Design a protein with these regions (language model features):
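Short, small-residue-biased leader/transition segments that mark boundaries at the very start
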Residues: 1-8
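Long hydrophobic alpha-helical segments that form multi-pass transmembrane helix bundles
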Residues: 10-21
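C-terminal substrate-binding/cap subdomain adjacent to the FAD-binding core in PCMH-type
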Residues: 24
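Active-site pocket scaffolds in enzymes
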Residues: 29-156
Length: 156
């Protein structure tokens, strides 16, 4: 699988207890830099604190699309099958999780077990702990306000 399209230049880092710090961390030159396509697993075992704290990818990136769901916020491509998935969203972030907690105990279709890192998830979202982080987009919903969010996963 390759690439994350317009994933932005920064992500929301964790401290050593897996809590979001409230900062934005530039990704340039780190294993979290997907601005240029490369395989997801290529850098996943790098000696980098943000990967070590969650044993792989389980991070939120700030999206460059800023609420514009008319262009892809991210994409992933499997060169073996030729499948491509594009993600369009109005959300400000995307969480990418690489199955770091899978241990081969959960089974799926035909009773096949899901081993460590045998999946990847793309979850559009606001940033974790945003009510307590003044730098993050607000998630406060006041009486009378309506929340709208739109996400499309398009397969080719």
């Amino acid at each position: 699988s390759r690439g994350l399209g317009d994933v932005y230049k920064r992500q929301t880092p964790y401290d050593d207890k897996k809590c979001v710090t409230g900062e934005y961390l530039p990704v340039a030159g780190t294993p979290l830099d997907f601005r240029m396509p490369h395989t997801i697993g290529e850098r996943i075992d790098a000696d980098y604190p943000q990967l070590k704290v969650v044993n792989g990818y389980d991070h939120t990136w700030e999206l460059n699309t800023k609420g514009d769901d008319t262009r892809p916020a991210a994409w992933v491509y499997d060169p073996t099958s030729g499948r491509k998935m594009e993600i369009f969203t109005t959300e400000p972030g995307i969480q990418i999780y690489t199955g770091n907690g899978l241990k081969g105990k959960m089974t799926g279709k035909r009773g096949i077990a899901y081993p460590f890192r045998s999946a990847v998830c793309f979850e559009t979202m606001h940033f974790q702990d945003s009510p307590n982080q003044p730098e993050f987009p607000s998630t406060v919903l006041r009486p009378g306000e309506v929340f709208h969010s739109h996400t499309v996963y398009k397969f080719e």
